[in-house]
Regions:
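N-terminal helix-cap/turn-to-beta initiation motif at the start of protein domains
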Residues: 136-144, 156-158
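Low-complexity acidic/polar repeat-biased segments
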Residues: 70-138, 203-236
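Short, hydrophobic/aromatic-rich segments at coil-to-beta transitions
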Residues: 35-46, 73-76, 144-148, 161-166, ...
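Glycine-centered tight beta-turn/hairpin loop motif at sheet-sheet or coil-to-beta transitions
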Residues: 50-56, 172, 214-217
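Acidic, glycine-rich calcium-binding repeat modules characteristic of RTX/beta-roll
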Residues: 1-30, 148-198, 217-218
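Predominantly extracellular/secreted and cell-surface proteins with exposed
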Residues: 28-73, 81
Length: 236
């Protein structure tokens, strides 16, 4: 599951800026909290107490070890953010969390693609991969995603080429989905109370599809795609 925050509300722009502004280049480091036993892998530039606004990444792990392109252990979460620093009180590395990635049914699959995506991330924030190495977006395509946006922030979500499910909350406002795959992607509008297509207003504007809730307080624009059917929705 990919959870957006206000900082990552426009997901395509966020990922592009993360790649551009990530200045750390190395293998990252492991740490274990003596107070909680929590294992972490972190990569980024330590603020040393003064915010630097530089992107960073923290992985929550159980019994984890890593060498470039190879690791063992169980990944509980991967969080992109900025302003990385060590919190002595918690004996943990922390950051301003901006994009939270986890698996709602357990650990994140630690495939070969994931291992190389982590390498690409820590070497310059290359979310789309580094040279011949896959990136985080390749992992999203491999595994599929469930993307959960914000309340009231007019998010822009992004399909990655696998089976993506876009979850819209009651009060999600007017969101946009780019790179929607008509063959496999799903729009979850169950929180709107919609039980079928009859509970939605669906129109075509140029090459886009515009979907509105029954009370027109929430909406979705699917860019560059028309011809959606009930198979593209998850209803209440």
């Amino acid at each position: 599951m990919i959870e957006l925050t206000a900082a990552s509300s426009n997901l395509p722009s966020y990922l592009a800026a993360y790649d551009t502004n990530f200045s750390y280049n190395g293998n990252g480091w492991f740490s274990r909290s003596f107070s909680t036993g929590q294992d972490q892998w972190s990569a980024g530039v330590d603020t040393e107490g003064v915010d630097n606004n530089i992107p960073s990444v923290i992985m929550g792990i159980d019994d984890y070890s890593y060498s470039p392109g190879l690791f063992n252990g169980d990944v509980t979460s991967l969080t992109l953010g900025r302003n990385l620093e060590y919190d002595a009180g918690q004996d943990l590395w922390v950051q301003d969390e901006e994009l939270i990635i986890n698996n709602v049914s357990g650990y994140m699959p630690d495939t070969t693609t994931f291992a190389y995506a982590i390498y690409s991330l820590s070497h310059g924030g290359a979310v789309d991969g580094l040279g011949t190495f896959p990136g985080l977006t390749d992992y999203f395509a491999e595994q599929g995603t469930m993307q959960v946006g914000n309340l009231g922030l007019d998010d822009t979500l992004l399909g990655f080429g696998g089976q993506d499910t876009f979850v819209f909350q009651d009060g999600s406002a007017f969101d946009t989905v780019n790179s929607f795959d008509l063959a496999v992607d799903i729009l979850d509008v169950s929180a709107w109370g919609a039980t079928g297509l009859g509970d939605l207003s669906i129109s075509t504007i140029g090459a886009d599809t515009v979907i509105s809730s029954s009370d027109f307080t929430d909406g979705i624009t699917i860019t560059g795609v028309t011809g959606l059917t009930a198979a593209n929705f998850e209803f209440a």
